[in-house]
Curated annotation (Swiss-Prot):
Name used for this protein in its record: ATP-dependent Clp protease ATP-binding subunit ClpE
GO terms of biological process kind: cellular response to heat
Lineage, uppermost ranks: Bacteria, Bacillati, Bacillota, Bacilli, Lactobacillales
Gene Ontology CC annotations of this record: cytoplasm; plasma membrane
Chain ranges of zinc fingers (C4-type): 3-32
Top-level taxonomic group: Bacteria
Membrane topology of this protein: Peripheral membrane protein
Length: 752
């Protein structure tokens, strides 16, 4: 590409600038670049830019900045997105005579700190900072580090949303209030934007020059405490691909000697980036900011309550404040307090504010003053038509002033509003669960027994364990309940798990089911928690941990657990005892709101001889538990809340199960307006045909398909008009489907 100036030499220098809002590229050779740099007003260069306005010189300031970092006196500071690279009018600021703790007068040119930083102390002085509550220990620790002679650079580390930035705002507020040591009196906390600092430094050496100028400015102003949020960004910021001169390396000497006081904030994971640079890390003093407790969060919310009430023009009840803290901690697992509780408070206020039909009183007052001024101006100019218009506007605004919302009319946000927002965020029916919780726990055993037949002992044990946990007597952080269901196939182990999910969590979809026959190999543990670093699939989430992370209120069913590899069972030792598991990405997943149920057929083989309608079952539990020791280790079995044996089903149990299955058939037939009536003899016949001591109740479902559903299908296809059907026994002992009316006629004739 040829030079745009001489059109002879190849262009080796490419400059970018914004002209009238459009980006323009200038391609120059070395000779033309030197000429233009020396004389930006060169006529050839002005012709190349296609600008006719002689007074407008878009590139003069650019090259002036390259030469001495000082624009012409009549040129405003260039923003960082333009070709000046963000240096603007900062050159003269550091050399002005001023007091060490005073803000420069408005007539002075802005320095880099004012251009790329925000004065947090000034914001605190205006009262625009939310109250900082419950962080006194962290603020005192930061002040102690800042009071040191060298290496006085605290770095706040903690999970996202725990209040790291709030600690710095609290420090700024203490400086404004004068509640700091003498060394920190009059200091100014400046929050530096590293991204803007790097922006516009396209030419090699510009960023280093800007950093040196920033350092010089900070050295001259001894009242500066520099705050860098996301401080890990300084590692690698501004470095070229083949160089090692980044912001972190430039700051190292000043940080070690105490010439620069720096406060940083970053997360635990991102602080590892700084830890990789040992020389930089030793100059930092980490301050851990822990997640507040629920009680501390409630105190924080009450402290900022007034700010949000004034902003949204609503009122928060004490119940809503407590619900925001407790329910967010209980149902929102992938974020941290107090951030998630504050978000609930803010969103609830926003939701209620949208229902208000009024304008902010401050806006009305401002518009009224503007209308009165415009009316006066129109009257002076004898524009009476315009004056009449503004007179009507003034009357309108005064009428709106009378409709100001009063304290009595201010909408109140209750616990229900918070619950509704959580339902939208998590798809958990929080309101329904809370309303039903009391009565649900009382009648839990009865509700389960109505769906799970013949396992009253198992149901009673489960209900007691869950009630004990919900009342608050359970061990903290452990799952709501952990059970091992043992018994022969087809006796209701999986069915009880499904009904338990419906009763406790409102839907069978809340059950997370795993067939443990898929986890028979040693490496299959990675499928549950995610592959470790260096293995294929590392970026993919684990099947178990990811589902529980997004749906913490779930029932986890591990079917046929004895078939899984022993390492899988070892992994669940921590889950059953501590209620937590770390996935392949290093995230800790909580199981404290889940119910864990494992089913097994282990130990039932030697007791099958006792299965039957009239068999005695004394001593059977002991034999099953004794056999479990051959399949599971003692430390594994010791961690369950209960090992529950499911007994073989009796004939009466099977009759009740048949009735439930037939009720399900009727429910499916109702979509076609068909109703089926089944006699007691038919039910007994179905039990005789479908019972197998080794198979439990599962063969009954196939029997009903063969003798009821298939027969109904054939009869309905031949008689589509018949909607009222009845299953009866024939004289030969077969099951037959007939019209209910015809069956009644025949039975009445036999009676006669």
């Amino acid at each position: 590409m040829l030079c745009q100036n001489c059109k002879i030499n190849d262009s080796t220098i490419h400059l970018y600038t914004n002209l009238n809002g459009k980006q323009k590229q200038i391609d120059l050779c070395q000779n033309c670049y030197k000429i233009i740099k020396t004389d930006p007003n060169n006529s050839l260069f002005k012709g190349m830019t296609d600008l006719n306005n002689r007074d407008f010189d878009p590139f003069g300031d650019f090259f002036n900045d390259l030469n001495n970092f000082r624009p012409s006196s009549n040129t405003p500071p260039i923003p960082p997105t333009q070709s000046g690279g963000g240096y603007g009018g900062n050159g003269g600021y550091g050399s002005q005579n001023r007091g060490s703790a005073q803000t420069p007068p408005p007539s002075q040119e802005k320095g880099l700190l004012e251009e790329f930083g925000i004065n947090v102390t000034e914001i605190a002085r205006r009262g625009d900072i939310d109250p900082v509550i419950g962080r006194d220990d962290e603020i005192i620790r930061v002040i102690e580090i800042l009071n040191r002679r060298t290496k006085n650079n605290p770095v706040l580390i903690g999970e996202p949303g725990v209040g790291k930035t709030a600690v710095v705002e609290g420090l700024a507020q203490k400086i404004v209030d004068g509640d700091v040591p003498h060394k920190l009196q009059g200091k100014q906390v400046i929050r530096l934007d590293v991204v803007s600092l790097v922006q516009g430094t396209g030419i090699r050496g510009q960023f280093e020059e800007r950093m040196q100028k920033l350092m010089e400015e900070i050295r001259k102003r001894e009242d500066i405490i520099l705050f860098i949020d996301e401080i890990h960004e300084i590692v690698g910021a501004g470095s070229a691909s083949d160089g090692n001169m980044d912001a972190g390396n430039i700051l190292k000497p000043a940080l070690a000697r105490g010439e620069l006081q720096l406060v940083g904030a970053t997360t635990l994971n991102e602080y590892r980036i700084i830890e990789k640079d040992a020389a930089l890390e030793r100059r930092m003093q980490p301050v851990k900011v822990d997640e507040p407790t629920v009680d501390e969060t409630i105190t924080i919310l009450k402290g900022i309550q007034k700010k949000y009430e004034d902003y949204h023009h609503v009122q928060y009840t004490d119940a809503a404040i407590e619900a925001a803290a407790t329910l967010s901690n209980r149902y929102i697992q992938d974020r941290f307090l107090p951030d998630k509780a504050i978000d609930l408070l803010d969103e609830a206020g926003s939701k209620m504010n949208l229902t208000l039909n009024f304008v902010d009183p401050k806006v009305i007052d401002q518009r009224l003053i503007e209308a009165e001024n415009l009316k006066s101006q129109a009257t002076r100019e004898e524009d009476f038509e315009k004056a009449a218009y503004f007179r009507d506007q003034i009357a309108k605004y005064k009428e709106m002033q009378k409709k100001k919302i009063t304290d009595q009319d201010t909408p109140s946000i209750s616990e229900k509003t918070i619950e509704h927002i959580i339902e939208q965020k998590t798809n958990i029916p929080v309101g329904d669960l809370k309303e039903k919780e009391q009565s649900q726990l009382i009648h839990l055993a009865e509700d389960l027994k109505s769906h799970v037949i013949g396992q009253d002992d198992a149901v009673d044990k489960i209900a007691k364990a869950i009630r004990r946990n919900r009342v608050g007597l359970g061990t903290p952080n452990r799952p709501i309940g952990s059970f091992l269901f043992v018994g022969p196939t087809g006796v209701g182990k999986t069915e009880l798990s499904k009904q338990l999910a419906i009763e406790l969590f409102g839907s069978a979809d809340s059950m997370i089911r795993f067939d443990m026959s898929e986890y028979m190999e040693k490496h299959s543990v990675a499928k549950l928690v995610g592959a470790p670093p260096g293995y294929v699939g590392y970026d993919e989430a684990g099947q178990l941990t990811e589902k529980v992370r997004h749906n913490p209120y779930s029932l986890i069913l591990l079917d046929e657990v004895e078939k899984a590899h022993p390492d899988v069972m070892h992994m669940f030792l921590q889950v059953l005892d501590d209620g937590r598991l770390t996935d392949g990405q290093g995230r800790t997943v909580s199981f404290k709101d889940a119910i864990i149920i494992m089913t097994s057929n282990a130990g039932t083989g030697k007791t099958e001889a006792s299965v039957g309608f009239g068999a005695a079952r004394e001593g059977r539990t002991n034999s099953v538990l004794g056999e479990l020791g051959n399949f599971f280790s003692p430390e594994f079995m010791n961690r369950f809340d209960g090992i529950i044996e499911f007994k073989a089903l009796s004939k009466d149990n099977l009759l009740q199960i048949v009735e439930l299955m037939l009720a399900d058939v009727n429910k499916r037939l109702s979509s076609n307006n068909i109703r089926l009536d089944v006699t007691d003899k038919v039910k007994e016949k179905l039990v005789d045909l479908g019972y197998d001591p080794k198979m439990g109740a599962r063969p009954l479902r196939r029997t009903i398909q063969d003798y009821i559903e298939d027969t109904i299908t054939d009869y309905y296809l031949e008689n589509p008009s018949e909607k009222d059907l009845k299953a009866v026994m024939t004289s030969k002992g077969n099951i037959q489907i007939k019209s209910a009316k015809k069956a009644e006629v025949k039975s009445s004739e036999k009676e006669k």
